[in-house]
Design a protein with these regions (language model features):
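Active-site phosphate-binding strand-loop segment of PLP-dependent enzymes
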Residues: 1-46
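Conserved active-site segment immediately N-terminal to the catalytic lysine
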Residues: 53-65
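Active-site C-terminal subdomain of aminotransferase-like
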Residues: 65-148
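A short linear hydrophobic-aromatic micro-motif
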Residues: 157-160, 192-197
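Conserved PLP-binding catalytic core of the aspartate aminotransferase-like
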Residues: 159-189
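PLP-dependent enzyme catalytic core of the Aspartate aminotransferase-like
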Residues: 200, 204-235
Length: 235
């Protein structure tokens, strides 16, 4: 295996399978080899603990539409001091995608190009809300929602796909290969929208999200729906 590369880009949480990767292991791997670490945390942000300094992460990426529960349209990038140094050392190859330009404008509290302004205001309000409440409380609520759903399914035939699932989503395997029927019945019979999987696993796996603007009452309704689907013999 050629390990002469200088950067590792990793998806912290795999949304199609629900798997949460071992970031400590990947962090150690990069440190031992002097590699930069870029973390795609689009669906892991807020749902999982992400300490850039502890991980030695140079870049962390996320988006507005997942756990932030804002409208889509804005990508968010956090750079460590070392990450900013690497940006400064590299030549600009595209004006519209220039991180140098973004950092220069950030010093004056601006973006280089007009952003999705409404979404930016939403993000500002959401982050202030999280700051006031505390990130630990926010993360604990997501984890609690995930645990409640998973506990409710322990006596059914559904199987968890990953051994190390993220708080953000629960991916479930259907032994009867009737994922589409489960999704359709949940939607038409109970007004609950479950997430299908694509490709070869479209009949075998479906997913349940735990991030976003989900209330305790929403989660209780979801659990009632799943309990009813099980009683109907769908799993």
């Amino acid at each position: 295996m050629d390990l002469s590369c200088g950067t590792l880009l990793v998806n912290m949480h795999e949304t199609s399978s629900g798997l949460l990767y071992d970031m400590s292991l990947l962090s150690d791997f990069c440190r031992e080899r002097g590699m930069a670490l870029i973390v795609d945390a689009v669906s892991a942000f807020i749902a999982e603990e992400i300490d850039m300094a502890a991980l030695g992460a140079d870049v962390v990426l996320t988006g507005s539409q997942k756990a932030l529960a804002c409208h889509p349209g804005i990508s968010i990038m956090a750079l460590s001091p070392r990450g900013q140094e690497r940006v400064a050392e590299n030549p600009e190859v595209c004006s519209y995608l220039s991180l140098k330009e973004a950092l220069r404008n950030g010093e004056r509290g601006q973006t280089p190009w007009t952003p999705a302004v409404n979404t930016l205001l939403e993000i500002n309000a959401r982050l202030r809300s999280i700051e006031a409440r505390g990130i630990d409380a926010e993360r604990a609520e997501i984890a609690s929602r995930a645990k409640a759903v998973r506990d409710a399914l322990t006596s059914t035939t559904l199987e968890m796909v990953p051994e190390n699932p993220s708080n953000a989503v629960t991916a479930l395997r259907c032994p009867a290969s009737n994922a589409k029927a489960i999704i359709e019945r949940a939607k038409t019979g109970y007004g609950m929208w479950l997430c299908p999987n694509g490709g070869a696993l479209c009949d075998e796996v479906f997913r349940i999200g735990h991030i976003g603007a989900i209330t305790e009452e929403d989660n209780d309704r979801l659990i009632d729906c799943l309990t009813s689907l099980s009683a109907e013999g769908l799993f």
